[in-house]
Curated annotation (Swiss-Prot):
Statement: the UniProt record of this protein carries the keyword GTP-binding: no
Main location: membrane
Listed InterPro entries: MFS_dom (IPR020846), MFS_sugar_transport-like (IPR005828), MFS_trans_sf (IPR036259)
Disulfide bonds: none
Name of this chain's protein: Solute carrier family 22 member 15
Glycosylation sites: N58, N63, N80, N106, N286
Any one GO MF annotation of this record: amino-acid betaine transmembrane transporter activity
């Protein structure tokens, strides 16, 4: 029998698969979320004041009065770290990399650069680890990446300099992003295909819980070095438990290693208490393969070109706004720990809400995505019309804090929807390529996001204007995409001409290419169903 039939025998979601979900979609995501937004606390700037007696006699300057004196401003533009060290005093409420290495004033950009370094590492990790796991196996690459992730993360806490810290943040990002992607692929390949969406939803939900958990931990641990090291205890526990999980049966089967695949399946069956099940794996004698598309095919066909450009921008905006609002939680006033916790917890309602709406005929994928993006954009844009410092009357409720949380709720819902929507818009022959290309732009948004909150130095509401304008624009552009609810899943390029896939007014538009016509007969005309394996290059809901 084939591997899918074998899963029906051993159990598609038995006790052992539930354990794997708990390990790889709950505990692991709590840890992954912590590393992703680590800089939100350890990069925060404690309250401080300036003692400029030597430069400006008989004056004392606080961080609320910076720039009032021309002499002070001129000095600040050229001051180096050692000079700043002599004249600034931080409060003892908590320590951070900003207070230890004096990353304030003209050096404050380095905090954002360290966060951007992490997301640059994620960008590299999701590309390289997908290919490595396809070649060497899911389990081996996952465990190796996880071990290095913990090693580099602990090194963060012992960084002797800012430069060492920034480099290790890049390495943590590469290992964290790569191994968490492979872990989710491994999880999906150990359960029945009907449960893949469930595993993704669980992972996304506990990523949000992980943000709140990190805020709680930071509230009790005020030393940034201690915090950076202790958050790895949870990761170490997950790593040790992961040493005993099997290799992916689907990957082994795809490599022709049938005896090892059978061994992995019997391992799962035993722990599912299916002791009497017996089977023998065989590859199908006659298997037809669909020709796969290339990256250039995304831009060769007119229909795909328009959809791809819009989707790339939407993915970019989702990541930019999601991480921008999360990392700027400390700039909203009040307790930084409460703000960060609320920023995570506010995501939880978005999961059931968006899943319900996208399956309703009167909303569907397109309208729901557009509604959440536009609502989030408008919530952020309204901030520009509010007074900077006024929390009385109506402004006690409608303020930058509440509107930021509304924006976080809506962008989280949009992020969840765009994964599902994108996979339905692309034909099977190019689905992985399309998802991977869109994911690249998501990573670019994550790299830029840490710098956007710094725009508050120019104008206090400017970060919200950026988030709002991009969110609203992406929402309006999403209306140009076709609806996919209850439409048949596209298989080949020729399926793009299906009426049910097209927007009103596109019926007469034939499938056209931007370069000389490409023969469609390169796409297999065989209709026989093939065995498909979950590819590690395909992004999932688990990896924001």
């Amino acid at each position: 029998m084939e591997v899918e039939e074998a899963f029906q025998a051993v159990g598609e979601m038995g006790l052992y698969q539930m354990y794997l979900c708990f390990l790889l979609a709950v505990l692991l995501q709590l840890y992954v979320a912590t590393e992703a937004i680590l800089i939100a606390l350890i990069g925060a700037t404690p309250a401080y004041h300036w003692d400029m007696a030597d430069l400006l006699p008989n004056q004392s300057h606080s961080n609320q009065t910076l720039g009032k004196g021309q002499a002070f401003g001129d000095w600040l533009l050229t001051a180096n770290g050692s000079e700043i060290h002599k004249h600034v005093h931080f409060s003892n409420s908590f320590t951070s990399i900003a207070s230890e290495w004096f990353l304030i004033a003209n050096r404050s950009y380095k905090v954002s650069a360290a966060s951007s370094s992490f997301f640059s590492g994620v960008f590299v990790g999701v590309i390289s680890f997908g290919q490595l796991s396809d070649r060497f196996g899911r389990r081996k690459v996952y465990l190796t990446g996880f071990a290095l992730d913990i090693l580099f993360a602990v090194a963060n806490g012992f960084s002797p300099s800012y430069e060492f810290f920034a480099v290790t943040r890049f390495l943590v990002g590469m290992m964290n992003g790569g191994m968490s992607l492979v872990a989710f692929v491994l999880l999906n390949e150990c359960v029945g295909t009907a449960y893949w969406a469930l595993a993704g939803s669980i992972g996304g939900l506990f990523f949000a819980v992980g943000i709140a958990q990190y805020a709680l931990l930071g509230y009790f641990i005020r030393s940034w070095r201690t915090l950076a090291v202790l958050v790895n205890l949870q990761g170490t526990l997950v790593f040790l438990l992961s040493l005993f999980i099997p290799e992916s049966p689907r990957w082994l089967y795809s490599q022709g290693r049938l005896s090892e695949a059978e061994e992995a399946l019997y391992f799962i069956a035993k722990r599912n208490r299916k002791l009497k099940c017996t089977f023998s794996l065989t590859h199908p004698a006659n298997r037809s393969y669909r020709a796969t598309g290339s990256f250039l095919d995304l831009f060769r066909y007119r229909i795909l070109l328009g959809h791809t450009l819009i989707l790339m921008f939407i993915w970019f905006v989702c990541s930019l706004v999601y991480y921008g609002l999360t990392l700027s939680a400390g700039d909203l006033g009040g307790s930084i720990y409460a703000n960060l916790a609320l920023s995570g917890l506010i995501e939880i309602p978005s999961y059931p809400l968006c899943i319900y709406l996208i399956n309703q005929r009167w909303f569907g994928r397109k309208r729901t995505l557009a509604a959440f993006l536009c609502l989030g954009g408008l919530a952020c844009l309204i901030v520009m019309f509010l007074p900077e410092k006024k929390d009385t009357g109506v402004f006690a409720v409608v303020n930058s804090h509440s509107l930021s949380l509304l924006g976080k709720l809506t962008i989280s819902a949009a992020f969840n929807i765009v994964y599902i929507y994108t996979s339905e818009l692309y034909p099977t022959v190019i689905r992985n390529v399309g998802l991977g290309a869109c994911s690249m732009f998501s990573r670019v948004g994550g790299i830029i996001a840490p710098f956007v909150p710094s725009l508050k130095e120019v104008q206090w509401s400017l970060p919200f204007i950026v988030f709002g304008a991009t969110g609203l624009t992406s929402g309006l552009l999403s209306l140009l995409l076709p609806e996919t609810l209850n439409s048949p899943l596209l298989e080949t390029f020729s399926d793009l001409q299906m009426y049910s896939y097209r927007r009103l007014g596109e019926e007469a538009l034939s499938l056209q290419t931007l370069d000389p016509p490409q023969p469609l007969d390169k796409v297999s005309s065989e209709s026989e169903e093939e065995e498909e394996f979950y590819d590690a290059d395909e992004e999932t809901q688990m990896i924001k």
